[in-house]
Amino acid sequence: ATAARELDTLSLHRPRNSETLAGLYWSGRAWEQLGDSAIARTRWSEVITREPGSYYAMLAARRLHREPWVPAAGSDTVVADSGAVAALRRAQILADLGMDYEADLEYDWIASRAERSVEATLAAAHAFRERDLAPRAIRLGNRALSSGAARDDRLYRVLYPLAYEGALTREAERHRLDPALVAALIRQESNFEPRATSRVGARGLMQIMPAVGRQLASAEDYHTWDAELLYQPDVSLELGTAHLAGLLSGYAHVSHALAAYNAGSSRAKRWLEKAGTDDPEVFVERIPYRETRDYVRIILRNRELYRSMYGTKG
């Protein structure tokens, strides 16, 4: 009871942030273990009220047997900008001709033109999203969010796009993966930027290290290999989903596999041993690397967003 009350004190009288939500959620779990389900349910309901789209609200909703949070429906109307539409056509022609630099200039002009209003920003973001230009859509979505755009599904669909949907779904299904999990992982790893390169050298949509890519390519019967292939979306999806499926087969819970994807299997196994529990929620809290801990939480939360918005559930 003392621990539960201490969690209450920390969470109920502090500014609203992720630590507050964690305190409320774990206070609920502590009260539940003490047999007071009424207080537990109150704490979990408070988490959902404060931040309905958060990781801890997702966990709380499960405890309360509620449906996960879904962004409210927004307007279906997106006002087209004739100048932007013409620029998009020019950019597509330039890209088809291999003139990527010139195409990027057109895209930059569209993004700059969209600054005049939140509505224009959202319209441009949706235009980019529809053309699988997810990184640009996300950037404009964040701009719209910071400018006061309504937090409805029209905004969230550009903040959480589903680019390369055909290849993503195909490779996810081939490896019996939840497409929403794959999309959430890519959203965190690269923002759907096929040319993304991390500071340690991971490449492509699913941020595969060249040495790992070589091993995966060999297992997938690639006759030739070049690390540059990791920048091709189809290749990244094929090898990345194979890698993720392999990790999932070796762990009891998706959170363990995500920790291994981010920090390596040797660390994930060591953390599992030190955690001393089969409870995946406790495991996540006990990951010693903040980067990996946040990584796992964000992907698990975003998986629910992708499921709710796109109906992608394996």
Predicted stretch roles:
Residues 1-2, 12-63, 67, 71-79, ...:
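Catalytic glycan-binding domains that act on GlcNAc-containing polysaccharides
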Residues 83:
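Acidic/His metal-coordination segments adjacent to aromatic residues that form catalytic metal sites
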